[in-house]
Amino acid sequence: MTEASRIVAPERHADDVGDTALRPQKLSEFIGQRQARANLQIFIDAARKREEALDHVLFVGPPGLGKTTLAQIVARELGVGFRATSGPVIAKAGDLAALLTNLEERDVLFIDEIHRLSPAVEEVLYPAMEDFQLDLIIGEGPAARSVKIELAKFTLVGATTRAGLLTNPLRDRFGIPVRLNFYTEDELEKIVSRGARVLNVGMTPDGANEIARRARGTPRIAGRLLRRVRDFAEAADAAAIDRAVADHALGALEVDAAGLDAMDRRYLTTIALSYGGGPVGVETMAAALSEPRDAIEDIIEPYLIQCGYLQRTPRGRLLTSHAFRHLGLTEPSRDPAQSGLFGQDEDR
């Protein structure tokens, strides 16, 4: 199983091409992240008045919350050029040098997954961010020489889902750190309604709410669900997407009222029925579901923990009362000693 095989995956899908049309073009159109938006607007306005490059910006947050969209909006609001790449694509220092030397004054360079830059590339990036210079070594051995190249004053916008993997020297060079949070149901409802208008699809308030509450707090998922529900509505010749149409479509897509899909429910049900609600080790769950451990930890569990359905304890995974209620199952009585609060399980 991969993230790309799940409609509720926050990572970008190959078929998310329609997502571009739904993206806001200005900060005033961007819904959610109120404080982050307000601060960015102030920093952008100040940089424009001074006719200076904006300080380097770091967007931190889970996938699908709008980091790339905000980076594009920043460049648009500043009225400057925008270049985009990602950490894994910049394989060597020469690749980064080619990008930086082609930037115009005050341009924005966006690096997605910036935590995946190699150490060698990072070393070249430090003086570029701080002094707007490139320090390159030309040649090899005794003939090698150091060359300094002056760069246009640019703005680096980095995005990461794993802030803990950033090195301290890189993190400290960003003057404007911005953390993005999951969206509220009301915010997602507005995003879905706006998306429906952009797609020229009829949408009732309760239809937008039905999609929003299953979108896992993530605009990218909301947009993807909207496009799929639109397909069902058009196939059924529905005049508009109301709650009944949305509920039918999302039910057919196996996305339940809490935004859980078939894999989420299979995971929870296996712990509930086969292991008495836990605790059970992650290696045991990987074997029971025929999934690699990484898929369990990185793809399935994060949202279940966020929703309060699952606890990671020293002895393994443990379902909460909330999970049993959602599954419609009776929670077994458990001895506190079995709750996973004590002891250590080698495959936790």
UniProtKB/Swiss-Prot annotation:
Residues covered by region (Head domain (RuvB-H)):
257-348
Q: Does the keyword Nucleotide-binding apply?
A: yes
Cite the GO molecular-function annotations of the record.
ATP binding; ATP hydrolysis activity; four-way junction DNA binding; four-way junction helicase activity
Q: Which residues bind Mg(2+)?
A: T68
Q: Which UniProt keywords apply?
A: ATP-binding, Cytoplasm, DNA damage, DNA recombination, DNA repair, DNA-binding, Hydrolase, Nucleotide-binding
Region of interest (Large ATPase domain (RuvB-L)), residue spans: 1-183
Q: Where is this region: Disordered?
A: 329-348
Residues involved in DNA binding: R293, R312, R317
What are the recorded Gene Ontology BP terms?
A: DNA recombination; DNA repair
Fill in the domain comment: Has 3 domains, the large (RuvB-L) and small ATPase (RuvB-S) domains and the C-terminal head (RuvB-H) domain. The head domain binds DNA, while the ATPase domains jointly bind ATP, ADP or are empty depending on the state of the subunit in the translocation cycle. During a single DNA translocation step the structure of each domain remains the same, but their relative positions change.
NCBIfam families tied to this protein: PRK00080.1, ruvB
| Record's protein name | Holliday junction branch migration complex subunit RuvB
| Organism of derivation | Nitrobacter winogradskyi (strain ATCC 25391 / DSM 10237 / CIP 104748 / NCIMB 11846 / Nb-255)
**The gene coding this protein:** ruvB
